[in-house]
UniProtKB/Swiss-Prot annotation:
Example GO molecular function: hormone activity
Function: Precursor for a gonadotropin regulatory hormone (GNRH) related decapeptide.
Maturation propeptide residues: 1-7, 18-37
Main location (coarse class): secreted
Organism: Rattus norvegicus (Rat)
Annotated protein name in UniProt: Putative preoptic regulatory factor 1
Amino acid sequence: MPYSLQPQPEGFADVPGFPLCMYMVRGSTWTLVPPDL
């Protein structure tokens, strides 16, 4: 995984370059999704 985050079905993560973006874990792949503004 590119980031050291705790695996969860979905949630929010403070990732450098992706502040407070929604992330979804599919299999072993992290998918960062921009928050709906």
